């Protein structure tokens, strides 16, 4: 889902960067006042490294499409949406500067859809369904978050005239729906494992 350099006009890319940095600054200010800041910093560093590595690889599928996971929904379940957005920013920055994944000028757009929008939607949907069943909440929120990020990217690319809306919907939506379903199932397994091995990791206040 990384948007490369050259697809978005500079003015639009700059606008996305400014919006993303303003939102991230608010998130950082809010989370920096939490009493468990030291634990948050450690987990933020560890999870950022995991996201950088995990999202840099693709997995071949029988459909002939390379599967690329997001990991950020899992970070939301552990750290909450604000810290997850910051993790996304750090991971995308490292990938853009050091690994050539995603464009430097498109950093703001990538953070906006794969970090901020994804994290907030995952958390909101999780809270909505968590009273019904935790596993259902994990699955549905992962799927809805990734689909929301996909629609955000389609919107960004459409107004940049990178391609037509019809082509973007037809090419991106089915693929990321498949990824979302797979990642939702995987997140259930991982969260169940964490809960049984060391539930204290999940004790961090999410917002």
Predicted regions and their residues:
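Membrane-interface helix termini and inter-helical loops of multi-pass transporters
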Residues: 1-7, 159-170
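Hydrophobic transmembrane alpha-helices
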Residues: 2-74
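Hydrophobic alpha-helical transmembrane segments
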Residues: 17, 41-46, 85-89, 112, ...
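Hydrophobic cores of alpha-helical transmembrane segments in multi-pass inner/ER membrane proteins
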Residues: 18-24, 115-125, 181-193
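Membrane-helix interface "capping/anchor" motifs
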Residues: 33-38, 76-87, 131-136
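Interfacial aromatic-anchored transmembrane helix boundaries in multi-pass membrane proteins
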Residues: 56-65, 90-121
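Short helix-perturbing small/polar motifs within transmembrane alpha-helices
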Residues: 111-153
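C-terminal transmembrane helix-loop-helix hairpin of multi-pass membrane proteins
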Residues: 136-147, 165-207
């Amino acid at each position: 889902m990384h948007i490369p350099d050259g697809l978005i006009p500079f003015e639009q890319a700059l606008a996305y960067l400014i919006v993303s940095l303003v939102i991230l600054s608010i998130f950082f200010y809010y989370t920096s006042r939490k009493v468990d800041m030291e634990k948050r910093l450690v987990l933020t560093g560890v999870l950022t490294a995991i996201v950088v590595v995990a999202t840099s690889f693709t997995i071949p599928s029988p459909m002939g499409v390379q599967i690329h996971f997001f990991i950020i929904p899992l970070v939301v379940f552990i750290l909450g949406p604000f810290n997850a957005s910051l993790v996304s920013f750090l991971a995308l920055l490292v990938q853009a500067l050091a690994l050539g994944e995603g464009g430097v000028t498109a950093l703001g757009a990538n953070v906006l859809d794969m970090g901020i929008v994804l994290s907030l939607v995952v958390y909101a949907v999780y809270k909505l369904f968590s009273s019904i069943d935790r596993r259902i909440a994990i699955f549905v929120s992962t799927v809805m978050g990734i689909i929301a990020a996909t629609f955000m990217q389609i919107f960004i690319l459409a107004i940049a005239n990178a391609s037509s809306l019809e082509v973007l919907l037809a090419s991106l939506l089915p693929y990321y729906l498949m990824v979302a379903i797979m990642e939702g199932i995987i997140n259930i397994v991982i969260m169940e494992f964490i809960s049984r091995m060391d539930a204290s990791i999940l004790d961090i206040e999410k917002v």
